[in-house]
């Protein structure tokens, strides 16, 4: 891991997300070799984790978000995260650059959702980093009145000083950073400078090994960290941590009419089946726990210079 990290940091010859892929693959290989889930190898703290429903952006009007949140509540979810109105790039799955946020409209959505689901559902907002500092403070104060749990990643993350000022100005916890590179080292600096109240961690930034380190740092400082996104690797990390440190599994993105429960054709099952109480049942198979559909994969191989490998 340290060797790969030096390639990322000094040589720039290995992209950080590719380092994460390699690290996760090595953990998967280790787990399959000893016939244990990675989460058990790392300590095995739990077999299920509370889930929150994470919405797609731009679902519709505030009433559409409210109805979707109610549907999720009826399905068993105890928490719901709003991704509201964003100038969205559908090809990159990220906000289009240099486009404004819509803080007033976002708050209308947040208010409609709270009124619909009542006081017994945990709610969060993620504006995808499109607000200014002034907008973030204003939205945060509205969310405090609506009893939202956290405000996630409201501004771009290249200016940690803006985040420090934001955390000073608000009582609602700020969850960040989400996308800034640097993995464990960047996030340690954010804790040191009090730029966020809760840490966002992700296997894409250094893999499972880096997430282990980030969890340990949060434990040392008495802070919570939350996994960004779902997936097999994040499932294993959550299985190795307690609810006191990493509370939720992010399940989504979800929208009305979207089939989340059917696995893609190259997999035998999804990684995050939901029970009736709104918990994700974590994988129990060896390694990362995924089972590949080799019949589908072999039937859909792409020929390369006349040679293909069948498993």
Protein language model features and the residues they cover:
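Conserved, mostly hydrophobic/aromatic
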Residues: 22, 35, 80, 126, ...
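A generic structural signal for well-ordered alpha-helical segments
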Residues: 30-31, 72, 117, 167, ...
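Shared catalytic-loop signature of beta/alpha-barrel
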Residues: 141, 147, 158-279, 283-286
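Extended hydrophobic packing segments that form well-structured cores
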Residues: 286-311
């Amino acid at each position: 891991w340290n060797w790969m990290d030096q390639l990322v940091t000094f040589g720039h010859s290995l992209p950080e997300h590719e380092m994460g892929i390699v690290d996760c693959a090595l953990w998967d290989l280790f787990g399959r070799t000893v016939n244990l889930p990675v989460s058990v190898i790392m300590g095995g703290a739990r077999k299920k984790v509370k889930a929150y429903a994470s919405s797609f952006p731009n679902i519709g009007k505030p009433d559409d978000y409210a109805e979707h949140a109610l549907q999720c509540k009826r399905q068993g979810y105890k928490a719901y995260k709003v991704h509201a109105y964003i100038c969205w790039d559908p090809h990159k799955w990220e906000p289009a650059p240099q486009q404004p946020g819509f803080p007033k409209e976002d708050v209308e959505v947040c208010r409609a959702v709270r009124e619909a689901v009542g006081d017994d559902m945990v709610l969060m907002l993620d504006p995808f980093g499109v607000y200014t500092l002034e907008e973030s403070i204003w939205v945060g104060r509205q969310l405090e009145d609506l009893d939202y749990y956290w405000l996630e990643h409201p501004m771009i993350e290249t200016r940690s000083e803006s985040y420090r000022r934001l955390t000073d100005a608000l009582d609602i916890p700020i969850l960040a950073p989400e996308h800034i590179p640097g993995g464990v080292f960047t996030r340690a600096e954010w804790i040191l400078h009090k730029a966020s109240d809760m840490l966002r961690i992700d296997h894409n930034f250094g893999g499972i090994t880096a997430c282990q380190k980030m969890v340990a740092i949060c434990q040392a400082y008495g802070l919570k960290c939350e996994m960004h996104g779902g997936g097999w690797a994040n499932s294993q990390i959550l299985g190795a941590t307690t609810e006191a440190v990493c509370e939720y599994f992010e399940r989504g993105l979800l929208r009305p009419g979207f089939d989340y429960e059917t696995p893609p054709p190259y997999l035998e099952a999804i990684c995050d089946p939901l029970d009736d109480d709104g918990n994700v049942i974590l994988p129990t198979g060896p390694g990362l726990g995924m089972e590949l559909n080799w019949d589908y994969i072999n039937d859909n191989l792409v020929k390369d210079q006349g040679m293909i490998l069948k498993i």
